[in-house]
Amino acid sequence: HNHFDFLPLSYSKLIKTPMITTIHGFSSERILPVYQKYNQTSNYVSISNSDRHASLNYLSTVYNGLNVEDFSFTGKPEDYLLFFGRIHPHKGTLEAIEIAKKANKKLIIAGIIQDEAYFFEKIEPQLSDQIEFVGAANPEQRKKLMGNAQALLHPISFEEPFGLSVVESMLCGTPVVVFNKGSMPELVQNGINGFLVNDVDGAVEVLKSIHTIERKICREMAISKFSAEKMASDYFKLYEQLLFR
């Protein structure tokens, strides 16, 4: 089972052992010809249906799985929204601030500063009592921030292959408000464990209904689709399929 990108594919024609290659997103379109070359000798697995490339043959999609015990359920949140992720334009930190301001909600921002110019020019001037930046969070801080939030804001501007923070939030029972891009429609069932929106104004509007989302259902749905046990079970079925076909 290859998780190491395309380099081990060069061995797939030299061995009789079946090979599964999980593609964790494409760093560049230029690596596609390499994957295409080994279409018949490696069995590709995507981490979301949205991250598939039409020119490749896929055996299946297996979603990333998390240890659900690392995330405890919080039934009664505090009165704030959370942005959790890299401080980068693609992640939508500035859009999260706009959403919070328009909704008249407190926003806590947690994450590493990946784009310093973006942070110091666009984000830092917006910080106030209402918009708070707490920096990178360790696992315990992450669990507390996510569990106590009314909602996680995830206003991405790119086709994200899989949103780990979205699943982590739901495992805490916290609903998510996400921009409808990439894998988000596979993670979020609109109106059930969060909301899919197209822009800032759409996010502001659905926040009026965030209280209608049952936090217990958020966790239950995340466990059923995105637990480590579910991921291991799905891969085990693929191993059996290859070994006994």
Predicted regions and their residues:
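Catalytic cores of nucleotide-sugar-dependent glycosyltransferases that transfer UDP/GDP/TDP-activated
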Residues: 1-245
